[in-house]
Amino acid sequence: MADLKPYIAKAASGEPLPLGDAKAAFDIMMSGQATPSQIGGFLMALRVRGETVPEIAGAVASMRSRMIPVIAPDDAMDIVGTGGDQSGSYNVSSCTAFVVAGAGVPVAKHGNRALSSRSGAADALAALGINIEADADTIGRSISEAGLGFMFAPMHHSAMRHVGPSRVELGTRTIFNLLGPLSNPASVKRQLVGIFAPQWLEPLAHVLKELGSETAWVVYGDGLDEMTTAGTTQVAALENGQIRTFEITPEEVGLRRCSPAELKGGEAAENAKALLGVLEGKDSAYRDIVLLNSGAALVVAGKAENLKDGIAQAVQSIDSGAALAVLQKVIAVSNDKPA
């Protein structure tokens, strides 16, 4: 039986693990050969010392080698936050996904239940009536027929069951928060990724480039793992093989600045109700932050020339009823009913 202890000792000593060692360590954890205490110790040793790009790449290689894939169009994208920002905000990326799909871009949305927050993507979507445990074929059909499919991480990364209890007990972000956006079961090449800390912007953009992404924006919104209308958003953009960094304020793209309190979410049922309100056209700070993120996603998808154009398309997606229609179709298809 393989032993995680040498890798724990190495990480705890402050020594970075080469990609091969990182993959080997994650292979041990993902195959059920490590105890919960060992997993927790290893994850926190990495976090305290600071995870490196080779360690993330090795962990992703281990996860990808075990995942159950989903077939999606070549131009599909993912819109995902790492979680772990401790903000308790609304499910911005989930709502954004429906708006982007309503604007004509296929979305293969990867997400999980809450691990370090009150309501994760899966919690809110399940509360809306989506069958989050649909199989890979049904999800592929949902993407092609409804424009969006939701991939519940534990269904596609079943090896994660070995580390899930340790993550919940730790109750804080770990390297696994970084891995979700990098381990999309549909192997999308375009991503809008929200990150929990600004020091990860450029490293994650480099990891995405190494993993074959064509276009991606990695964003940090002043305490949020999404673009924010309550402050300044920092962006590391992978475009045409190059990575550039810049900042965005809501005012410069014609949106209202709000207070962080206006973006506070609640439990899954409350967040689901708020998400539905946005798709039904209700005006709110939640709508504005969704418009900002949707505009950016449409730029990443190549559908919009710039952020203002993307926001205009997002407004049209909501106000025409297209985004709400996507939600209704996804609910139907995920529950094996005609769209």
Swiss-Prot record:
Entry binding sites for Mg(2+) 1: 93, 226
Keywords: Amino-acid biosynthesis, Aromatic amino acid biosynthesis, Glycosyltransferase, Magnesium, Metal-binding, Transferase, Tryptophan biosynthesis
Cofactor binding description: Binds 2 magnesium ions per monomer.
Pfam family, one: Glycos_trans_3N
Binding-site positions, anthranilate 1: 81, 112
Cofactors (names): Mg(2+)
Superkingdom to which the source organism belongs: Bacteria
Residues reported to bind 5-phospho-alpha-D-ribose 1-diphosphate: 81, 84-85, 89, 91-94, 109-117, 121
GO biological process: L-tryptophan biosynthetic process
Gene Ontology cellular component terms for the protein in this record: cytosol
Statement: the UniProt record of this protein carries the keyword Glycosyltransferase: yes
Pathway: Amino-acid biosynthesis; L-tryptophan biosynthesis; L-tryptophan from chorismate: step 2/5
Known catalytic reactions: N-(5-phospho-beta-D-ribosyl)anthranilate + diphosphate = 5-phospho-alpha-D-ribose 1-diphosphate + anthranilate
Keyword Cytoplasm: no
Residues reported to bind Mg(2+) 2: 225-226
Binding site for anthranilate 2: 167
Molecular functions per Gene Ontology: anthranilate phosphoribosyltransferase activity; magnesium ion binding
EC number: 2.4.2.18
Membership in a protein family: Belongs to the anthranilate phosphoribosyltransferase family.
Protein role: Catalyzes the transfer of the phosphoribosyl group of 5-phosphorylribose-1-pyrophosphate (PRPP) to anthranilate to yield N-(5'-phosphoribosyl)-anthranilate (PRA).
PANTHER family on file: ANTHRANILATE PHOSPHORIBOSYLTRANSFERASE
Subunit composition and interactions: Homodimer.
Protein name: Anthranilate phosphoribosyltransferase
Classification of source organism: Bacteria, Pseudomonadati, Pseudomonadota, Alphaproteobacteria, Hyphomicrobiales
